């Protein structure tokens, strides 16, 4: 964690989320670079299961910013967010003639890096929505 107070780097990570990394990346790409206030609204109306895990992680990162640096949630934007593949949960499915077939259930690790907003980023992201 960056301890300088000029523009602190706030991190939060969630590991071993039971979701395919490919499916999680399609949600993460929608909120990368957005202000913190916009991201939960976007996630709330997306129909994907991973949105709940990402919104919990966002609120955790905002709580870290408030507790560790005393920053307000309105001053934050998502600087970087990445999804990495985790290990597979390996299960067995029984097949014909006494055989077994492997089932691989993927997991992923999500890391969010937030920074303090300098003001210009909010104006750009509001223009995207036509406001």
Curated annotation (Swiss-Prot):
Ribosomal protein as a keyword of this entry, yes or no, is: yes
Compartment annotation = Plastid
Gene Ontology CC annotation, any one: large ribosomal subunit
Please give the chief subcellular localization of this protein: plastid
> Which terms does the record give in the GO molecular function aspect?
rRNA binding; structural constituent of ribosome
Please give the superkingdom of this protein's source: Eukaryota
One Pfam family for this entry, by name? Ribosomal_L22
Keyword Ribosomal protein listed? The answer is yes
- Which UniProt keywords are present, listed alphabetically? Plastid, Ribonucleoprotein, Ribosomal protein, RNA-binding, rRNA-binding
Q: Which Gene Ontology BP terms does the record give? A: translation
HAMAP family from the UniProt entry: Ribosomal_uL22_B (MF_01331_B)
Describe the subunit structure. Answer: Part of the 50S ribosomal subunit.
Q: Which NCBIfam families match?
A: rplV_bact (TIGR01044)
Say what the protein does.
Answer: This protein binds specifically to 23S rRNA.
Family to which this protein belongs: Belongs to the universal ribosomal protein uL22 family.
Protein name per the record: Large ribosomal subunit protein uL22c
């Amino acid at each position: 964690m960056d301890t300088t107070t000029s523009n602190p780097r706030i991190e939060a990570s969630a590991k071993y989320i039971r979701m395919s990394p490919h499916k999680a990346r399609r949600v993460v790409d929608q909120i990368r670079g957005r202000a913190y206030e916009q991201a939960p609204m976007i996630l709330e109306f997306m129909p994907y299961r991973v949105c709940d895990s990402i919104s919990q992680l966002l609120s955790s990162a905002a709580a870290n910013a408030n507790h560790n640096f005393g920053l307000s949630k309105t001053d934050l934007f998502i600087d970087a967010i990445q999804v990495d593949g985790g290990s597979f949960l390996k299960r067995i499915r029984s097949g014909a003639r006494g055989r077994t077939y492997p089932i691989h259930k993927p997991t992923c690790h999500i890391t969010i890096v937030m920074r303090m907003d300098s003001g210009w980023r909010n104006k750009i992201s509001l223009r995207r929505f036509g406001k």
